[in-house]
């Protein structure tokens, strides 16, 4: 039986079909981005004038997601995440960037349980000519004075996001720190696992996230899944290069360029 014809005088509101296997669709799918998200981006990009793929994709990204870099010229930030995602190196890179901009920087670690974490941050701090402060419990964090004109970067121990006791302990530290919690995620993970992890930290108050290991992964599906599912904002992206390098401010344009890079 033939499908019923469209009634005369009505408007067909179905979305126009996409070109089969469009170059943009293939490029996004190669990152492991779920098909519904890919097609949403492609439709928004196709609605833009012009044939500059990077520009139309950037416009689509700006419509769908938030971009809110830390900037690290001022403020008080408490960095959180799972073990091994690169929080300490991320903090050191952001500190180096702030120093380069002529900003006063304060480095604090609340990771009192891991000597290696303290030693790693101290090594980076020495390179930058900064003394670190250790505030390993809620009382010590609560006692930290607020320094006007300085950016304060606070490291924390990585936690198992599925451990209620570890989540509770981290939440207490974050509250005592009186700082904005910022999620640090490593690129290259499974998208579903990454979203589940990010969901836990969003519930702890994170509204922005930093991505590490951008230079050693080829697929950004997990990175793209987080703002799609949770609505938190892209902040900075980091590469494991020299301490004073490898900090990228996420914008719709820079993300579009990364998604379209040939691999």
Report each predicted region and the residues it spans.
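Short glycine- and Lys/Arg-enriched binding-loop motifs that mark or flank ligand-binding interfaces
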Residues: 77, 154, 236
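N-terminal loops that bind phosphate or other acidic moieties
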Residues: 100-103, 152-153, 158
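Short strand-loop junctions, especially beta-strand C-caps/beta-turns
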Residues: 82, 110, 157-159, 186
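Conserved catalytic-core segment of NTP-binding enzymes
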Residues: 120, 133-146, 151, 159-263
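Primarily NTPase-proximal linker/entry elements flanking Walker-type ATP/GTP-binding cores
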Residues: 1-113, 120-138, 142, 146
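Active-site flanking residues adjacent to catalytic metal/cofactor-binding acidic residues
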Residues: 110, 154, 211
């Amino acid at each position: 039986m033939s499908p019923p014809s469209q009634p005369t005088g009505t408007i067909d509101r179905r979305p126009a079909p996409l070109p089969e296997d469009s170059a943009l669709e293939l490029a996004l799918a190669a990152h492991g981005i779920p098909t519904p998200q890919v097609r949403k981006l492609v439709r928004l990009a196709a609605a833009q004038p012009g044939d500059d793929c990077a520009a139309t994709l950037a416009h689509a990204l700006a419509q769908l997601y938030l971009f809110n870099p830390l900037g690290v010229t001022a403020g008080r930030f408490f960095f959180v995440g799972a073990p091994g995602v690169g929080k300490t190196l991320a903090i050191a890179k952001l500190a180096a960037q702030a120093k380069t901009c002529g900003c006063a920087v304060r480095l604090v670690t609340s990771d009192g349980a891991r000597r290696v974490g303290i030693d790693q941050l101290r090594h980076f701090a020495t390179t930058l000519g900064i003394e670190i402060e250790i505030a390993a419990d809620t009382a010590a964090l609560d006692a930290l004075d607020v320094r006007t004109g300085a950016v304060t970067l606070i490291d924390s121990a990585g936690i198992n996001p599925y451990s209620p006791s570890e989540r509770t302990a981290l939440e207490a530290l974050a509250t005592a720190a009186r700082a904005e919690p910022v999620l640090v995620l490593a690129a290259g993970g499974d998208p579903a696992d990454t979203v589940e992890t990010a969901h836990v930290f969003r519930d702890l108050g994170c509204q922005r996230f930093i991505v590490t290991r951008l230079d050693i992964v080829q697929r950004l599906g997990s990175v793209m899944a987080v703002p799609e599912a949770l609505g938190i904002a892209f902040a900075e992206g980091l590469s494991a290069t020299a301490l004073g390098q490898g900090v990228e401010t996420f914008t719709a344009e820079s993300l579009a360029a990364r998604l379209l890079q040939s691999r």
